[in-house]
Amino acid sequence: MVFFMSRGLPSNKTYDPVFANNDWAAIIDACHANEVPDTWVSDGSCYKDMDIGGKAYRIDIIGKNHDDLADGTGKAPLTCQMHDCYDTTYQMNSSNTNAGGWRDCQMRTQTMPALKALLPAEVQSRIREVNKLTSAGNQSSIIVTTSDEL
C-alpha cells in the first residue's frame, strides 16, 4: 500500500531527525511545508507504526520527491507503503487475472478506497493523487498512466 502527501507552504517547525519519533501531524506538516528531513530516508529508521482499527501497521518511506503529483504541481514529498498489510487477502479481479490492468481492476476501484477509509482521518485528508505507470494488463506491453492515492 502506498500513500502520498501534499506539498505547500514552508513551516517554522522543527522535526525530529528520526522519522518514527514524529507523530503523524508533524509528518503531514513536514510534507505540506516541503521540509522533509533527509534523515527520514537515509538513516535506516524510515518507518513508523500507524494504528488502524486497533492494530499497529508498519509504514515505510519508499520515496522522497519521487512521484509526480497528478495535478501537475510537482513531486509528492513522501511516498510510503504499508508493511504486512492486512490479515485479509484480496484479489486483483474476481476472475483471478489482470485483465483490464491496474487501472480497471477490482483491487484499485473497490478495495483500495475501502482500505483508505480505515486510515486515521488526519492521514486520509492529506493523501494526494500521483501518477503511476502500469501495464494495460492481460499480457499487454502497453503502459498506461493511472492517478492513484493508494
Descriptions of predicted regions:
Residues 3-150:
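Collagenous Gly-X-Y triple-helix signature in extracellular proteins
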